[in-house]
């Protein structure tokens, strides 16, 4: 954190204020294919050298070319009184998807809790026919299918889309993964073998297994208990995979696989 806000650069030896302040909380940072940096969170605006940048509520872009903060979606940004954006993801075309707690983003009907920003046109759009509550996680498959997780219990009017769903481009609407899960999803990550790893507050994703973490193989949920593992003591907030294929999770748990040293962070090397 820099002295003027909640954003700074690490040069390798020190933190540097990038001529800006972000008064609030930054939840996610993503780099666009062109090198621009996008940040999102819960903040009213950002500033360049002390000058407030209009229409940067909840999301802003650091322009690599102009070396300054800019609104996302000229000229009005997200243009909503409530803008809490938790998560972002770029697709293969360089377009941006955002999830959070907001309704009618940029005054667009059905742009509720999830929306798309087409970088080439600078326009926001709805994705499908709407979601009923907040989106906390986004993952895009190698084939370009968008998956979301969160606290919602319906997407596109489908009540089987409980806490997790994917977007069917052909039907132009949301579809369920089986009949969904029984509680919140906070993390989604595709593994190298194509499985979608899912972390959250749910239990019993697979019979009596799959508490707090499971996977989706394209047709069914699976669990690490199926591989002989002991489960977690509490929920998962984040999932990542290192270059060696090791799955790393973080969360509220104090025990993973029976190991009390796996306290809030653990690795799976199976």
Label each residue range with its predicted role:
Residues 1-270:
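Extracytoplasmic surface signature
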């Amino acid at each position: 954190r820099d002295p003027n806000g909640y954003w700074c650069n690490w040069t390798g030896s020190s933190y540097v204020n990038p001529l800006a302040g972000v008064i609030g909380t930054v939840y996610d940072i993503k780099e666009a294919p062109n090198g621009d940096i996008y940040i999102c969170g819960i903040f009213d605006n950002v500033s360049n050298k002390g000058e407030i940048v209009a229409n940067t509520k909840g999301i802003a872009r650091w322009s690599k070319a102009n070396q300054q903060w800019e609104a996302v979606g000229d000229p009005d940004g997200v243009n909503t009184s409530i803008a809490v954006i938790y998560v972002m993801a770029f697709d293969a075309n360089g377009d941006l998807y955002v999830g959070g707690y907001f309704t009618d983003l940029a005054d667009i009907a059905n742009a509720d809790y999830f929306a798309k920003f087409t970088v080439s046109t600078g326009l926001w759009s709805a994705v499908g026919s709407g979601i009923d509550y907040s989106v906390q996680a986004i993952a895009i498959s190698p084939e370009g299918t968008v998956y979301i997780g969160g606290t919602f219990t319906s997407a596109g009017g489908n009540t089987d889309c409980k806490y997790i769903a994917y977007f069917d481009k052909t039907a132009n609407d949301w579809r369920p993964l089986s009949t969904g899960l029984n509680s919140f999803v906070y993390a989604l990550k595709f593994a190298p073998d194509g499985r979608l790893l899912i972390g959250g507050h749910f239990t019993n994703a697979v019979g009596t297994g799959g508490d707090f973490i499971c996977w989706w193989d394209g047709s069914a949920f699976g669990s690490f208990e199926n591989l002989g593992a002991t489960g977690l003591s509490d929920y998962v907030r984040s999932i990542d995979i290192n270059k060696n294929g090791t799955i790393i999770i973080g969360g509220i748990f104090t025990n993973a696989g029976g190991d009390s040293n796996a306290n809030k962070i653990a690795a799976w090397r199976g």
